[in-house]
């Protein structure tokens, strides 16, 4: 009986909640890979799911990621011209 | 342009995840994304609600010796 209560307490302890931003709807895998790699290098990547092309960054890291995406897309557009 | 959605990343056991999915099923106003078996993205304002409901559900599943004693004497 005591073991069972301990188990539930352990399960509650095992829940982790972290504020962040979910990045999704990438155009293709290249875009996902570039941006998630950037987030990883910055050290702000909390979670990644390449199969679904989704990742979660810290709250603080999100702005830099958005700026990176803008720069990346600009570069890709100019190289296409 | 990829989409960026503000939320709270929850990391937990599959059993706890199933409970959160269950809590969400009545109104669908908690979960933003079911990422995998052990990860969920939930609405920032719903963290406290989830915590309270989980605590209640887990307490209901905990053995209560007084209840058992009452049942035993009732026989």
Curated annotation (Swiss-Prot), chain B:
Please give the subunit comment from the record: Component of the 7-subunit TFIIH core complex composed of XPB/SSL2, XPD/RAD3, SSL1, TFB1, TFB2, TFB4 and TFB5, which is active in NER. The core complex associates with the 3-subunit CTD-kinase module TFIIK composed of CCL1, KIN28 and TFB3 to form the 10-subunit holoenzyme (holo-TFIIH) active in transcription.
Give the PANTHER family listed for this entry: GENERAL TRANSCRIPTION FACTOR IIH SUBUNIT 5
Q: Name one Pfam family in it.
A: Tfb5
Residue ranges spanning the membrane: these are none
For this entry, the protein name equals General transcription and DNA repair factor IIH subunit TFB5
GO process terms (BP) = nucleotide-excision repair, preincision complex assembly; transcription by RNA polymerase II; transcription initiation at RNA polymerase II promoter
Q: Which organism is it from?
A: Yarrowia lipolytica (strain CLIB 122 / E 150) (Yeast)
GO cellular component terms listed in the entry, alphabetical order? cytosol; transcription factor TFIIH core complex; transcription factor TFIIH holo complex
Q: Which key words tag this protein in UniProt?
A: DNA damage, DNA repair, Nucleus, Transcription, Transcription regulation
Report disulfide bridges, numbered on this chain. Answer: none
Q: What does this protein do?
A: Component of the general transcription and DNA repair factor IIH (TFIIH) core complex, which is involved in general and transcription-coupled nucleotide excision repair (NER) of damaged DNA and, when complexed to TFIIK, in RNA transcription by RNA polymerase II. In NER, TFIIH acts by opening DNA around the lesion to allow the excision of the damaged oligonucleotide and its replacement by a new DNA fragment. In transcription, TFIIH has an essential role in transcription initiation.
Report the sequence similarity comment from the record.
Belongs to the TFB5 family.
Highest taxon in the source lineage: Eukaryota
Q: Where in the cell is it found?
A: Nucleus
User: InterPro entries given for it?
Assistant: TFB5-like_sf, TFIIH_TTDA/Tfb5
